[in-house]
Every structure is written in C-alpha cells, then in structure tokens.
Amino acid sequence: MIELREKNGSAVFVVKAQPRSSKSRVCGLYNGGLKVNLKAAPVDDAANRECCELFSKLFRIPPSRVHILSGQSSRTKTVMVEGISSKAAALVLEPFG
C-alpha cells in the first residue's frame, strides 16, 4: 500500500524515479511509495518536469499544482499534489498498489 501523508490539504508521497526509460509511466509500488519510469534524462531538470507532468495527467490537474518537495537531484523524491486530499489521492493511486 502507498504511504500517503497530507500537508496543508495536499497529498504527499514518495516516488522512486528511473530516468532514461523507453516510456514514462507509473510502474507500481516501491518501499511504500511509487516507482515511475521517466523517458527524460536527469539533465537540466527534465526528469523532474516530466515526473510532475506524469502526475498532473494522472490526477487531471495542471502541472503547476504538482511539486517535488525534496529529492530534486536524487532518484527518490517526495512529491506533493496540491489541492488533492490524501483520501482522493489514494483512490487515484489504488490501481498501482
């Protein structure tokens, strides 16, 4: 199960990113968080932007409402989805874990 927290009315969870994959997608669970494959290389913040875009499409919100709180230069990232409660996020992320 995905470990979700709530911070100021926004869902927060951990993501393990794998850059330079053949396509961008959510793969499933990884140590209480989500594992994602990202097509972009980790150069000039491209993989971080792609990670935010992936979750914005998944939650059907603008990319500006998805933030990486920590791990900008790491494969393990803490992601916040602004304006989505942890309960609503759990429903969206349920198929992945």
Swiss-Prot record:
Q: Which domain of life is it from?
A: Bacteria
Give the matching InterPro entries.
Answer: DUF167, YggU-like_sf
**Pfam families cross-referenced by the UniProt entry:** DUF167 (PF02594)
| A single GO cellular-component term on record | cytoplasm
**Family indicated by similarity:** Belongs to the UPF0235 family.
From the Swiss-Prot or TrEMBL record, give the protein name.
Answer: UPF0235 protein Ppha_2415
Q: What organism is listed for this UniProt entry?
A: Pelodictyon phaeoclathratiforme (strain DSM 5477 / BU-1)
Biological classification of the source: Bacteria, Pseudomonadati, Chlorobiota, Chlorobiia, Chlorobiales
